[in-house]
């Protein structure tokens, strides 16, 4: 799955009292791209307390932390109706920008 697909389908994931979804992706030329390979991990709260590097090394070697799914969902909802982010590509680029520079 690529990062664009994960972002555009973010509402398919719902955290629970026991599980949280977190997105990891592969950087291309030192940055995330819409076509970067991505993985959505379902983590327990106990796993969430682990160091991010430990999660990466044990569950998705070669991938880097992108964002927690609930944050992607909040961002997507915030920009969904804004005029400047009409296309899916613009929405995806904005969320990637946030992950790299604002989070």
Task: Give each language-model segment a name.
Residues 39-100:
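Amphipathic protein-protein interaction modules
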């Amino acid at each position: 799955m690529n990062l664009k697909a994960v972002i555009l389908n973010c509402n398919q994931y719902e955290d629970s009292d026991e599980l949280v979804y977190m997105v990891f992706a592969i950087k291309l030329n030192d940055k995330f791209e819409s076509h970067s390979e991505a993985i959505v991990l379902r983590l327990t709260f106990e796993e969430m307390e682990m160091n991010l590097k430990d999660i990466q090394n044990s569950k998705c070697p070669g991938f880097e932390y992108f964002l927690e799914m609930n944050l992607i969902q909040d961002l997507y909802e915030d920009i969904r109706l804004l005029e400047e982010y009409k296309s899916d590509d613009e929405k995806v680029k904005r969320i990637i920008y946030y992950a790299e520079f604002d989070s």
